[in-house]
Regions:
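Juxtacatalytic substrate-recognition/specificity segment
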Residues: 1-64, 71, 88-89, 150
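Active-site-proximal alpha-helical
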Residues: 70-90, 96-156
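A flexible loop/linker signature enriched in serine peptidases of the S9 family
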Residues: 92, 96, 194-195, 213-223, ...
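Beta/coil-rich, acidic/histidine-enriched accessory regions frequently appended to metallopeptidases
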Residues: 143-244, 248-253, 259-261, 279
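Pro/Ala/Gly-rich low-complexity, hydrophilic intrinsically disordered segments
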Residues: 159-204, 230-234, 354, 427-449, ...
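Blade-edge beta-strand/turn elements of extracellular beta-propeller
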Residues: 182-189, 327-332, 386-395, 443-448
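Conserved beta-strand position repeated across blades of beta-propeller domains
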Residues: 202, 254-256, 299, 343, ...
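Short coil/turn segments that connect the beta-strands within blades of beta-propeller domains
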Residues: 206-208, 258-260, 303-305, 347-348, ...
Length: 495
């Protein structure tokens, strides 16, 4: 049994979800300031929307709630829009709904799909009529006790016409995006459930295995797929299917390139555990990770002796270098910025994504002078000189994440510059800055897109030794895996 997610339980919460009790909101820092900010905005918006529709005292609430019932897409869609009007992830989920012809009837949608469809309607209204009409729609809906009348009096069109107009708007938009887009190659023959979410695709060092995690109503499973035998096997299972808020932050996984073992990080009763799994023998051992509150990403060193963690401790997300032999970690960054997706690169340098506004990695007490940015760039940090990080992408209006080393000169990562998350490649170059008693060089990076899919590339994992990549997409209502090898990994798509 569990009381997590029950509205009356105001003493617990899951990251990424906002609990509302009366006029109180309960939020939890998920390791990303943008997500945290969205939680706060959504909580405030839900309180304000509730007061606008039902009144701000209990008598009005009881009276109005008995006289009118607002559909989920109307209320939840509006609070989601107020918290985050639009982003590439919402766009991708809506693109999938419209592609499956599920958008025309909101009453048949369930779960998050209802909220996404509702949010798209409010987004369309704001883009077409202006966001100033939204409070008027709420007021007229409350006064007339009818959402149909609210839209008709303010917009001058019926709700049915509004729905058709919104659908045509997005259909035209997505048809334009698909023109000239890169087609998918054959997907891996891995069965996935429509009712489950999938994450953490990781290719083993020898290129034979692909591991991934499934999450169905908080019941998580870890699978290992054998490319050679075309078979998969479940190795870990945790949790139970419960109708509650779904925590999708675990498990976190990566392969040890030397031993060939899979390391899986899970959370149980407030403690972090790292389990070693041999694909042939099964579970080997389990140890507790100390002095960390939450681990979000991990990456093994080439010698298999160290692990990079992006982890939360004392309310901030930083990069840690973990020693397997000593079961202890060294903190590499210490500031208010979100430092995510660490990866080993050439020599003693690492890659990571961050929303930092300053290249100094130890600004523990400077909370106001250098405010975090709303998007992340890819950074390089030399472990021998770990005071300054070098910005590799420098795109303040676009978001990048999940860097991975391609070789000693190049790196690949995910970016949303086109409005759809695709894979990019970058390399560091140099030019002569001045010639005096010695030549001074200026270092910079060059970045260009590798893929042009019309759907978000949600996650990927690259095997540097075998030049093999596994990609994860949401297509036709279910998650699908696609693997590539050799030159296909870095061949630039030209329409």
């Amino acid at each position: 049994q569990s009381n997590v997610g029950i509205p009356d339980a105001d003493d617990s919460n899951i990251g990424g979800k906002t609990q509302i009790v009366g006029s109180k909101i309960f939020v939890y820092y998920p390791g990303d300031l943008n997500e945290f900010r969205t939680q706060i905005r959504k909580g405030i918006a839900e309180v304000l929307v509730g007061q606008m529709l039902f009144g701000d005292n209990w008598r009005e609430m009881i009276k109005n709630n008995a006289l009118i019932s607002f559909p989920t897409w109307f209320t939840k869609g509006l609070t989601n829009y107020a918290a985050q009007p639009w982003d590439v992830d919402i766009d991708d989920r809506l693109r999938d709904l419209i592609g499956r012809d599920k958008y025309s009837n909101f009453n048949r949608l369930k779960g998050d799909n209802v909220e996404i469809a509702g949010q798209s309607v409010w987004y369309y209204i704001a883009e077409t009529y202006g966001s100033n009409v939204i409070p008027n729609i709420l007021y007229m809906s409350r006064v007339t006790r009818s959402i149909e009348s609210g839209f008709l009096f303010v917009l001058g069109i019926s709700l049915e016409t509004l729905m058709k107009d919104a659908q045509e708007y997005f259909e035209f938009r997505y048809e334009t995006d698909e023109y000239g887009a890169q087609e998918f190659v054959d997907f891996d023959p891995i069965r996935t459930k429509r009712s489950a979410d999938y994450s953490e695709p990781k290719v083993s060092d020898d290129g034979r295995y692909l591991t991934y995690a499934s999450n169905q109503m908080s019941k998580t499973k870890v699978f290992i797929y054998d490319y050679v035998k075309n078979k998969r096997k479940r190795y870990l299972r945790q949790g139970h299917k419960l109708d509650r808020l779904n925590d999708q932050s675990y498990p976190i996984m990566d392969w040890n390139p030397v031993t060939g073992e899979l390391h899986v990080i899970t959370e149980k009763k407030g403690k972090l555990w790292m389990t070693r799994i041999d694909p042939e023998k099964g579970k080997v051992s389990k140890i507790e990770l100390l002095r960390l509150e939450k681990v979000m990403e991990m990456d093994f060193s080439p010698d298999g002796k160290q692990i990079l963690f992006s982890a939360i401790n004392k309310g901030q997300s930083d990069i840690y270098l973990y020693s397997i032999a000593a079961n202890s970690q060294k903190q590499l960054t210490n500031d208010i910025y979100d430092d995510r997706y660490p990866a080993f690169w050439k020599g003693n340098s690492i890659l990571f994504a961050s929303n930092r506004a300053n290249d100094t990695v130890n600004l523990a007490n400077n909370y106001l002078e250098f405010a975090p940015l709303e998007s992340k760039d890819i950074y390089q940090l030399d472990l021998n000189d770990d005071e300054v990080a070098f910005n590799l992408t420098q795109t303040p209006t676009y978001d990048e994440k999940s860097p991975a080393a391609y070789n000693d000169e190049k790196y690949i990562y995910l970016g949303d510059e086109s409005g759809i998350r695709n894979r990019y490649i970058g390399r560091i170059d140099s030019s002569i800055l001045s010639i005096d008693t010695a030549i001074t060089y200026r270092y910079f990076s060059k970045n260009e897109p590798l893929t042009a899919y019309f759907r978000n590339l949600r996650e990927f994992d690259f095997n540097r030794n075998e030049k093999k990549i596994a990609e994860l997409f949401l297509l036709d209502g279910r998650f699908k895996f696609m693997s590539k090898e050799g030159n296909e990994v870095v061949d630039e798509y030209v329409p």
